[in-house]
Amino acid sequence: MKKFTQIIDQQKALELTSTEKPKLTLCLTMDERTKSRLKVALSDGQEAGLFLPRGTVLKEGDILLSEEGDVVTIEAAKEQVSTVYSDDPLLLARVCYHLGNRHVPLQIEAGWCRYFHDHVLDDMARGLGATVVVGLEKYQPEPGAYGGSSGGHHHHHDHHH
């Protein structure tokens, strides 16, 4: 079984020759991309293991290096998500504020934001005036927006309103 132990940094990835570039991919859910130890199947069906430093969070496009010198590109799996759209930047900022206030991990892009599907949150976003589309999409929340597999964080603090 191949053991992938390193992420190749962006500069080294650019320097890979065409024969060194990854031909295999590894499709992982957001939860799987937060695991430092994981048994996986590569795009060609080979079994492999991830043995990465604790706290590693993989992103789409990351390139991993195995002990044997093999390389593989990380691909984000499509997951059931809600995508909120608005042409009004202030409205989208308000939606992101309210979702963040509920400690919801968010992917934020120009004109839209995305979170794991939750019909209660969808209703809230619609109530604020945004358009919500539910479907299978790739999901990459902002770094540090989650703690473990639950997707939330667990420290205590006072909210002053």
UniProtKB/Swiss-Prot annotation:
Compartment(s) where it occurs, according to its Swiss-Prot or TrEMBL record: Cytoplasm
Keyword Cytoplasm: yes
One of the protein's GO biological processes: urea metabolic process
InterPro entries reported for this sequence: UreE, UreE_C_dom, UreE_N, UreE_N_sf
Pfam families: UreE_C, UreE_N
Keywords for this protein: Chaperone, Cytoplasm, Nickel, Nickel insertion, Virulence
GO cellular component terms given for this protein: cytoplasm
Keyword flag Cell division: no
GO molecular function, one term: nickel cation binding
Family: Belongs to the UreE family.
UniProt xrefs under HAMAP family: UreE
Subunit details: Homodimer.
Reported function: Involved in urease metallocenter assembly. Binds nickel. Probably functions as a nickel donor during metallocenter assembly. It is not essential for urease activity.
Name of the protein described by the UniProt record: Urease accessory protein UreE
